[in-house]
Design a protein with these regions (language model features):
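Short membrane-interface loop/juxtamembrane segments of multi-pass integral membrane proteins
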Residues: 75-93, 167-168, 173-189
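Active-site recognition of the HExxH zinc-binding catalytic motif
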Residues: 48-61, 101
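Metalloprotease/metallohydrolase-associated module, dominated by Zn2+-dependent proteases
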Residues: 1-31, 76-164
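Short pre-active-site segment immediately N-terminal to the catalytic Zn-binding motif
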Residues: 33-49, 90, 94
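Juxtamembrane boundary at the C-terminal end of a transmembrane helix
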Residues: 209-217
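Catalytic Zn2+-binding segment of zinc metalloproteases
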Residues: 56-69, 145
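Juxtamembrane/start-of-transmembrane alpha-helix segments at the extracytoplasmic/lumenal side
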Residues: 188-202
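A glycine-rich, hydrophobic loop/mini-helix early in the fold
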Residues: 36, 40, 44, 66-79
């Protein structure tokens, strides 16, 4: 049994996001709902991203991960919110967690928004679907792999797979294999329950100030 440590290639993922956003904006334009993309929408979307990560955590929890082993954080200098799993979880469990936000506040809410003509909900759902690019790259990579255990260690843009098979023979979408070795050598940092980078704190404060100005000035 060996561990295989992967790091997300953020340049490739960001490029994919841009590619997905182009048809998204074309769709929004022809649907005639771009008028809803105002300041209030982006404030709501900011909190929608929190919900995205919360759903990842619910997926972990329903797959048997203890509440104390689910870590949340923000590292906006890398352009991400994240949810990390500090327990080893099987292939089925990580796939469930990856797909929770895509289906529940992406596909499902998109059709709900169309049925009730709630175009704010439609926009939030479309933006969330595009924001699932990293999750979907992991999903389509993982379904091709033989059985493994998944665990997060100390990098919000990376993860570790532990398997009896040689996973180095498999290419993962937008993921680089940076190391491998004996699972007993793995060391995990003692993360707090919630981790927020200094840049993210500053960003949150700016958002809060803008929100106060919008509502009270």
């Amino acid at each position: 049994m060996k561990y295989f440590r992967y790091s997300m290639n953020m340049k490739k993922l960001n490029f994919l996001c841009i590619l997905f956003f182009i048809p998204l904006f074309i769709l929004i334009y022809f649907m005639g709902i771009s008028k809803y993309m105002n300041f209030n929408f982006f404030v709501i979307y900011f909190f929608w991203m929190f919900l995205h990560e919360l759903l990842h955590g619910i997926g972990f929890y329903l797959s048997g991960v203890s509440f104390n082993s689910i870590i949340y954080g923000a590292c906006l200098e890398k352009g991400i919110f994240y949810c990390m799993c500090k327990e080893r979880i099987d292939k089925k469990g990580i796939i469930i967690s990856l797909l929770f936000p895509f289906f529940f506040i992406g596909v499902f809410t998109f059709f709900i928004g169309l049925v009730f003509e709630n175009y704010i909900l439609v926009l939030l759902s479309l933006f969330n679907i595009v924001g699932c690019v990293g999750d979907l790259c992991m999903f389509f990579s993982f379904v091709r792999l033989p059985d493994f255990k998944y665990v997060d260690l100390d990098d919000c843009t990376g993860f570790v797979l532990i398997s009896d098979s040689d996973l180095s023979n498999y290419k993962l979408f937008c993921m680089d294999n940076v190391s491998c070795g004996n699972p007993d050598d793995l060391v995990s940092n003692n993360f707090k329950k919630i981790n927020i980078s200094k840049f993210s704190y500053i960003f949150f404060m700016v958002m809060l100030i803008l929100l106060i100005i919008e509502f009270f000035v």
